From Swiss-Prot:
This is WUSCHEL-related homeobox 11. Expressed in crown roots. Expressed in the shoot apical meristem (SAM), leaf primordia, and young leaves. Belongs to the WUS homeobox family. Residues 84-112 have a biased composition (Low complexity). Residues 1-21, 79-115 are annotated as: Disordered. Induction: Induced by auxin. Overexpression of WOX11 stimulates ectopic crown root development. The gene is WOX11.
Length: 262
């Protein structure tokens, strides 16, 4: 009798690998893990695994093996997503090299209408949706979205789709119009895009998820006198004589509050 232990568990123990156990990470733990993975640490060594496990334990029970297998599975998902993106890019390149995309019925249309913005609008929106929330790829003409910090959690892309579709529709409606109307339309699209951006973002301060405003923040009013903010890499964030940071914090990054020595 093996006392209820499976052969896989014995094999993992014999190979020196961590023993897998069932674990359902909490949302706070997922945020921390995704932030670390997207920062470039995709295969942490043993000492880093222990450090990450201690950080996660603030939000619930977790073992070193859970952290090890989470990164293993996350790397597999990332490679699978990368292959899907490469296949989509190859298909798009093949369609572009073969000329205008085939339509359901292009007969009866005058030459030049088959490739009009109306027929390309669907392809543009589909492409933007396919590229959303990828930590390894970004849409060239748009700023990064919140979803890019969350890996497989598909929160990003909505603002990009809306901006792209409104730009296409403006081109269709204003074809042949004056340059002043085109400039006004572009200004309106920019206002629409920035109005969709949240006023706050989530960072980790001393391991706790914290909502902070975008842009430079006032350290003294938020955290008190004689405090400094240090990035998880050990770099001190510069502030002026009034305690206001010179640069904005970065979404999903980890920081630590340090008391200034007198």
């Amino acid at each position: 009798m093996d006392g209820g232990h499976s052969p896989d568990r014995h094999a993992a123990a014999a190979a020196g690998e961590p023993v897998r156990s069932r674990w359902t990470p909490k949302p706070e733990q997922i945020l921390i893990l995704e932030s670390i993975f997207n920062s470039g640490m995709v295969n942490p060594p043993k000492d880093e695994t222990v450090r990450i496990r201690k950080l996660l334990e603030r939000f619930g029970a977790v073992g070193d093996a859970n952290v090890f297998y989470w990164f293993q599975n996350r790397r597999s998902r990332s490679r699978r997503r990368q292959r899907q993106l490469q296949a989509q890019a190859q298909a798009a390149a093949a369609a572009a090299s073969s000329g205008s995309p085939p339509t359901a019925s292009s007969g009866g249309l005058a030459p030049g209408h088959a490739g009009s913005p109306a027929s390309s609008l669907g392809m543009f929106a589909h492409g933007a949706a396919g590229y959303s929330s990828s930590s390894s790829s970004s849409w060239p003409s748009s700023p990064p979205s919140v979803g890019m910090m969350m890996g497989d959690v598909d929160y990003g892309g909505g603002g990009d789709d809306l901006f792209a579709i409104s730009r296409q529709m403006g081109y269709m409606d204003g074809g042949g119009g004056s340059s002043s109307s085109a400039a006004a339309g572009q200004h309106q699209q920019q206002q629409l895009y920035y109005s969709c951006q949240p006023a706050t973002m989530t960072v980790f301060i001393n391991g706790v998820a914290t909502e902070v405003p975008r842009g430079p923040i006032d350290l003294r009013s938020m955290f008190g006198q004689d405090v400094m903010l240090v990035h998880s890499t050990g770099a001190l964030l510069p502030a002026n004589e009034y305690g206001i940071l010179l640069h904005s914090l970065q979404m999903g990054e980890s920081y630590f509050l340090v008391t200034r020595s007198s």
